[in-house]
């Protein structure tokens, strides 16, 4: 089985746990030498299921049963994956087992001993204080520029007095609170898009119904919309219940849209770098409080592990790699699989377009982290960055060898390529198809914000973010400054991009639901690969680490999508294709 790490983003934490396991084994052997018989030592405390949250209550229900792992293509049971929840199910009888077993041998432990000289705290701090924000996986979730001051939308003459009075009392986004240290966490979040009518029903709070009314009036009667919006802004607050907080950020975005619609000058853009560390800590807070990213990485990695079977050479093509956080657990699982570790693992990294025109330095740091970690595992590893824009790449750039098992990964990445035309998405998918992959893993937000008109898009986004705000409200206290930061600098920015003033080519928050992705994937020649019962059960076990009142569940969407849902509303969807 692969070793469990409570923080799947911290590569060195995994290695340190393995060293701890080795030390316990050595102590056990010494005791056995002197006493001939001793019971096995307990698992390390770091292996125990745990979840760092501001509010946490343990489950009292029975732990979900785990089925037998599905056989690989070579007739053997695939390796065991790690996830950030802090627990794992081995293929054998015991809940906790030897991390490497006989197949790994003592040579692996001798390699891992070098981790004692590796400063894991320094590595984590480097992600916060040294590298620019855009050089991390956070760019997949957060817009780097903080919101500028909100211009008040000019109302009609009849509404001028009411608007001015309410605008004076209405709260405005303020500077982020001071940095607080956060527990380390894994990585990406996401969503499902109901019809406009069901979206209206799910946003039944009066303040949200008023927002929906404002959005409908925005195009036809901006003055009326401004007057109604003033009342909403007076009642909304970023410190209230989920509906009040949601209204706070949506009213802000709609206010900007109305202002720009009347020809108001754009606000000056502040320095995009100033909130880098703040956003990094927000990202960690969210992933410590909610299982979104853990679910996505766990499920995609399990599909890759099963599809590659006992292949001796494995080539992963990651469209959108930055830190490579997703691959720590998979490298661990491949290094400890029953069939033996691969003779070579190669990752080809295509940088996200949001890394900017010069991603080389960021990817070099990613290369170093992954290479050093693979060395600790005793794995022959190669990282190859492709620095040309994705639309300029062709099959020959990937240097696929005939005896390699290829896996292509799109983790919260393809939606960046959506636009008024799907041509760029289709081009990239056809490129992936040309590599003859054993599997293509796709993780996307489950909400329709691409082709929908503004009113429907506003309703879809409001319903989606309502679920996110509620899930965070259960995980963190109302007075938590960390919660305020996450909602302001992560969710607030994305709301701004989805329903703010930008339209056409300037609108960058273009997500699509699973049915739209199914159409695109099948058009490009892919067919769905059902996720195994084992992958489903691992995801169930991940959710078991969260309190039952969190109301998380797994929802299967046809033909082969698995979604993480809040109160049965899908938020993040993962699928596999070939």
From Swiss-Prot:
GRAS domain: residues covered: 198-578
Family, per entry: Belongs to the GRAS family.
Functional description taken from the UniProt entry: Probable transcription factor involved in plant development. Involved in environmental abiotic stress resistance. May increase the expression of stress-responsive genes. Binds DNA in vitro.
Motif VHIID location, chain numbering: 314-318
Taxonomy, superkingdom: Eukaryota
GO biological process: regulation of DNA-templated transcription
Assembly and interaction partners: Homodimer.
Compositionally biased spans, kind Pro residues: 146-156
GO molecular function: DNA-binding transcription factor activity; sequence-specific DNA binding
Effect seen on changing residue 551 to A: Loss of DNA-binding
Effect on the protein upon substituting residue 485 to A: Loss of DNA-binding
Effect of residue 478 to A: Loss of DNA-binding
Region listing for SAW, in residue ranges: 500-578
Compositionally skewed regions (Low complexity) per UniProt: 18-29, 62-74, 157-173
Name of the protein in question: SCARECROW-LIKE protein 7
Domain notes: The GRAS domain is involved in DNA-binding.
Segments for region (PFYRE): 406-497
